[in-house]
Amino acid sequence: MSPQFLVIAYYTESTSYEVLAGNLKRSLQNFSLPHYIEAINDLGSWEKNTHHKAYFIKEILNSRNQDVLYVDVDAQFKSYPDLIPSLDCDIAYRTQDFKWRADEALSGTLFLKNNDKVKRFVDRWIELNEAVPAERMKPETWEQKNMQRAQREMTDLVYYNLPPEYTFIYDHMKIMYPRTTPVIEHYQESRNVHKRSNSNPNFRVRR
């Protein structure tokens, strides 16, 4: 099996994400998946570090002649992602209705065709990120919301809604989809990061 896509991820050096990068890498090696995982310097906040996602993806699309499967670094591959090579679209990610928020774009697993349309989409995503700095308690400013806005603006961009097993949040989706076996499971390290950095003991992020 020789995939035509490259799995990519990045993490902030000297943080808890560094250990998780090793877990992700081992899971990719289990299925002989070509991958590139990059370490970056801390940009000053979790919000800025997450907004780096679009820049990172742009860099890879411009430097590689491959389609890209981006995953957050706290993810692990549980089986070979058979769906990905067969996708006939420009972009694919999961849009999910949660009880606390509907129509939520999940950018933790994101497939991108390496073509000019997608590159224009990523440029627009970056523009939206730069226009409104992310704020932790305002989901409408998060990078994934800007990604969704950019995708919906571009009516010629072919979108596919990934099934839940490809962006399987380890606890919430286990309850929502009890009979679904995850292909790519996400462990939501951002929750721990927020708890450590917030002085309010009752603080909780729904992600």
What feature does the model see in each segment?
Residues 3, 64-67, 73, 157-158, ...:
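Short coil/turn segments at beta-strand junctions that form active-site/ligand-binding loops
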Residues 25, 57-58, 81-85, 144-151, ...:
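Short amphipathic alpha-helical segments and helix-helix/interface helices
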Residues 1-66, 116, 185-196, 200, ...:
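N-terminal anchoring/stem segment of glycosyltransferases
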Residues 36-38, 69-72, 92-93, 158-163:
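A structural signal for short, well-ordered beta-strand segments and their strand-loop junctions
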Residues 17, 21, 50, 103, ...:
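A structural signal for well-ordered alpha-helical scaffolds and beta->alpha junctions
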Residues 51-119:
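GT-A fold catalytic core of metal-dependent nucleotide-sugar glycosyltransferases
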Residues 119-207:
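Catalytic core and acceptor-binding pocket of nucleotide-sugar-dependent glycosyltransferases
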